[in-house]
Amino acid sequence: MRFSPRRSAASLLILSLLLAGAPQTLAQPQQTATPVDQGASKAQVRPWLYENSDVPIDAAWRFGTLSNGLRYAVRRNGVPPGQVSIRLRMDVGSLMERADEQGYAHYMEHLTMRGSRHVPDGESKRIWQRLGVTFGSDSNAQTTPTGTTYALDLPQATQASLTESMKILAGMMAEPNINAGSVDAERAVVLAEKRESDGPQSRISDANRLHFFAGQPLAEHAPIGTVDTLKAATAAKMEAFHQRWYRPENTVIAISGDIDPAIAEQLIKDNFGNWTAPGKGAAIPDFGAPDPKAPATRVFVEPGVPVSLTMAWLRPWTPHADTIVYNQDKLTDMLALQIVSRRLEQAARTGGSFLQASVEQQDVSRSADGTFLSIIPSN
């Protein structure tokens, strides 16, 4: 494959789709979580999701923050009946790793899913299977550059199954099975994942990342890590990583399903309220900004892969207050992008010089605000 991306500091008006209602981002900074009265005074404490925002509060969600800093959000959703979904997000991903810890966030995900010191190794999986949970579809986890999310869907949720599941999850987060045996067992798994993922698309993705984000942590910190750092992992190193990042103040829990919100809230308080982490947590590192002086182009050859061209306009990523005006501007930008992509699609259908083309905007892992144009030429 010939790959020729281009870097520019040009500023374009575009949009990243609003992350509305994403479970892992919902919570509130007060111990008690009472449904919000839309007619309350302006002095009311707004849920943390709505801090510095004038977006109307969704009163269907019950927000709260425990005294240990853990944030949560719960709501009733009776469709489909009898089912409950739990999401737990830990604010640690590959970008939080030190140079000699590459792959540790993903490694920790594997260790955490094995169980805890209160549940025999591997027993949590068997318990959930008895509750009708299918591993992979109903129970899974994912590590990204900026976070680790644990997902559990209970197809036949009862008070007993919810209580058991929340107890297991709390133990996994606070006291996972980190010992020489579990670290060695999961090392074989993550190294196998790395070997299996080392295909053409993975190499193209790595080349993209190294070029576009040169000089930034994102360029070289893929969640899967490196062979050297994975082989060097020990129980002591993984325990130190866990203590730095797996902390209640870095945790957000969301529960949605056929459940009374008051019961869901109490389950969180009962199982996570006493969680304390030793020492002091680590500060979020600086993710850097795109370097306008970095090389503008790169050609990457991958045999057997169709020729494509990617151009990127990269700007520093900055957080924005989630206001109504901000979202209106994002909507305008989204429409503009859709218009451009539609015209590119029509040009391709009428026999243009390319088979496919599209444009999109991405806020990339808190590292860049980018506009990307992708083209597959016709010859």
Where are these predicted regions, by residue range?
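Bacterial N-terminal signal peptides that target proteins for export
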Residues: 2-12
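Bacterial N-terminal signal peptides
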Residues: 11-21
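Signal peptide processing junction and immediate N-terminal pro/mature segment
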Residues: 21-34, 108
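An aromatic/glycine/proline-enriched structural segment found at the starts
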Residues: 31-47, 215, 252-310, 314-315
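Histidine-acidic residue clusters that define the catalytic metal-binding segment
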Residues: 39-62, 150-153, 210-251, 283-288, ...
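Mature N-terminal segment immediately following signal peptide/propeptide cleavage
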Residues: 48-89
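Active-site-adjacent, His/Asp/Glu-enriched structural segments that form or flank metal-binding
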Residues: 80-81, 90-105, 109-204, 229-232, ...
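A structural supersecondary motif
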Residues: 94, 134-138, 312, 337-376
